[in-house]
């Protein structure tokens, strides 16, 4: 039974190419079962990777240090390498579970890079998956009524009236008004589904952490009780975390409300939602490829698409996606913000219009849509030698030099001076977007690496443009979408 269970959980591709695999082992039943199942499976391979069990001591409970020692003893008995890493420093008073999760994965990635491991595995189970679904579903349902009210307003024509006014002096204004109303009704109703389904796909089996290390959760289809039965058959015991019974936590309350039958029913819904998310990611990717989009010098431009592309249910999602990426946002637009974007977008208006969304300026006219970073909250910062800084949610700067680097944005005078004294071939510079580009400066002058090909004042610096919503963790379900968008932001400057 044990060997059969192990073979059903893993794919050969999970461990290719992989010299070492990090297993997150807390000592609980799920993670211990993962460790022993991986060990059994790897024994069937000709050239198995090395297992390294890593325990993250969050230092939130006095028992945590001893629990890490117990895991180390278990690993020693089974000839498995074990490492304990600790979440140091002051802990936040609010959103503790969220912060602990971020810290835990960051520590695992750091240890993976230190050990030369390209894969991390965690012991998330079907129970975790179903609990996540229930919590997200409850939150989304609270917002559903408000969003439906907004969609209803669009259907009644209220939201379209502002745009109809812009067309009142044009021939065929009535026809255009009907077109605008129908387009926005169509988009609003369908785009709601895009975000709603994305959230309910829950925990992906495979993801990418920090765009470097694979994260696989092979136990997502297995119930916790099955894993505990497996451990009992082998005579293994595990550590029970008392917080797993603390009803002050939402997850515990949800867990205790779930019956076995409910578990099975929700699992089917999750599988459907995951499939829908993959399909939607592909639909969004196909739409992006069909559109004429350029990203250059801090400005994104979407050429006005054909009417059938404007009416595509994913079109506002695409505009919102590029707004977030240009604005340096860490999260894709919520249902509410996407609905607001739908209300503001109307490419049939003959007048130039401008508004802000997700830290980004969106300007549209008869030619198309332009997006660039809004000029606010772009703070200056110092990058000390041998340090890496994520700046404005858009750039990751690594300083390999001997002096600190000042980062920020250029004022208009600095920008004009740089353009005049450089070999830049910009015929019609768009200064608002150019003023959002990363600038390096010191007492000797300033340098905008994205604009100027040769270093003026700084060397031994690596600058990479990032996509913040997908930078820390990127789900396999979104692979089609990420693969299409990434080339637009594939900027890396090494000096």
From Swiss-Prot:
Pfam family name, one: ATP_bind_3
InterPro entries membership: Rossmann-like_a/b/a_fold, TilS/TtcA_N, tRNA_Ile_lys_synt, tRNA_Ile_lys_synt_N
GO molecular function, one term: ATP binding
GO BP terms: tRNA modification
Predominant location: cytoplasm
Reaction equation(s) it catalyzes: cytidine(34) in tRNA(Ile2) + L-lysine + ATP = lysidine(34) in tRNA(Ile2) + AMP + diphosphate + H(+)
Sites where the protein binds ATP: 26-31
GO cellular component: cytoplasm
Functional summary from the UniProt entry: Ligates lysine onto the cytidine present at position 34 of the AUA codon-specific tRNA(Ile) that contains the anticodon CAU, in an ATP-dependent manner. Cytidine is converted to lysidine, thus changing the amino acid specificity of the tRNA from methionine to isoleucine.
Record note on domains: The N-terminal region contains the highly conserved SGGXDS motif, predicted to be a P-loop motif involved in ATP binding.
Similarity field: Belongs to the tRNA(Ile)-lysidine synthase family.
The protein, known as: tRNA(Ile)-lysidine synthase
């Amino acid at each position: 039974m044990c060997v059969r269970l192990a073979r059903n959980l893993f794919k050969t591709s999970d461990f290719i190419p992989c010299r070492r695999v990090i297993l997150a082992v807390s000592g609980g039943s799920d993670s211990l079962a993962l460790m022993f199942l991986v060990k059994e499976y790897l024994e069937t391979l000709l050239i198995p990777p090395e297992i390294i069990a890593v325990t993250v001591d969050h230092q939130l409970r006095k028992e945590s240090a001893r629990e890490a020692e117990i895991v180390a003893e278990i690993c020693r008995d089974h000839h498995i390498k074990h490492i304990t890493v600790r979440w140091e420093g002051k802990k936040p008073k609010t959103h503790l579970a969220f912060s602990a999760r971020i810290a835990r994965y960051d520590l695992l990635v750091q240890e993976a890079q230190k050990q030369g491991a390209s894969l991390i595995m965690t012991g998330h189970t079907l129970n975790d998956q179903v609990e996540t679904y229930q919590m997200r579903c409850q939150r989304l349902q609270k917002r559903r009524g408000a969003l439906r009210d907004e969609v209803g307003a669009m259907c009644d024509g209220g939201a379209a009236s502002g745009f109809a006014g812009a067309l009142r002096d044009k021939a065929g204004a009535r026809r255009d008004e009907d077109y605008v109303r129908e387009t926005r009704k169509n988009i609003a109703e369908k785009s709601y589904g895009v975000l709603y389904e994305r959230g309910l796909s829950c925990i992906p089996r495979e993801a990418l952490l920090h765009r470097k290390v694979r994260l696989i959760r092979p136990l997502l289809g297995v119930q916790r009780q099955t894993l505990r039965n497996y451990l009992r058959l082998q005579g293994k015991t595990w550590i029970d975390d008392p917080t797993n019974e603390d009803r002050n936590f939402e997850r515990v309350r949800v867990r205790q409300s779930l019956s076995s039958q409910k578990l099975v029913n929700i699992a089917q819904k999750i599988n459907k939602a995951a499939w829908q998310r993959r399909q939607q990611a592909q639909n969004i990717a196909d739409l992006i490829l069909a559109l004429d989009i350029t990203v250059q010098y801090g400005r994104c431009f979407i050429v006005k698409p054909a009417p059938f592309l404007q009416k595509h249910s994913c079109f506002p999602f695409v505009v919102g996606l590029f707004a977030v990426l240009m604005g340096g946002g860490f999260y894709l637009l919520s249902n509410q913000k996407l609905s607001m974007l739908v209300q503001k977008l109307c490419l049939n208006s003959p007048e130039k219009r401008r508004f802000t969304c997700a830290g980004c300026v969106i300007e549209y006219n008869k030619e198309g849509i332009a997006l660039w970073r809004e000029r606010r909250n772009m703070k200056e910062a110092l990058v000390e030698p041998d340090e890496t800084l994520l700046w404005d949610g858009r750039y990751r700067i690594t300083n390999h030099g001997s002096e600190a680097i000042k980062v920020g944005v250029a004022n208009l005078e600095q920008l004009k001076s740089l353009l005049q004294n450089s070999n830049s071939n910009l015929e019609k510079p768009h200064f608002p977007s150019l003023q959002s580009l990363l600038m390096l400066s010191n007492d000797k002058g300033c340098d905008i690496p994205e604009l100027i090909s040769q270093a003026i004042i700084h060397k031994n610096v690596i600058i990479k443009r990032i996509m913040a919503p997908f930078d820390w963790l990127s789900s396999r379900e979104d692979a089609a979408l990420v693969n299409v968008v990434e080339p637009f932001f594939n900027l890396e400057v090494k000096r």
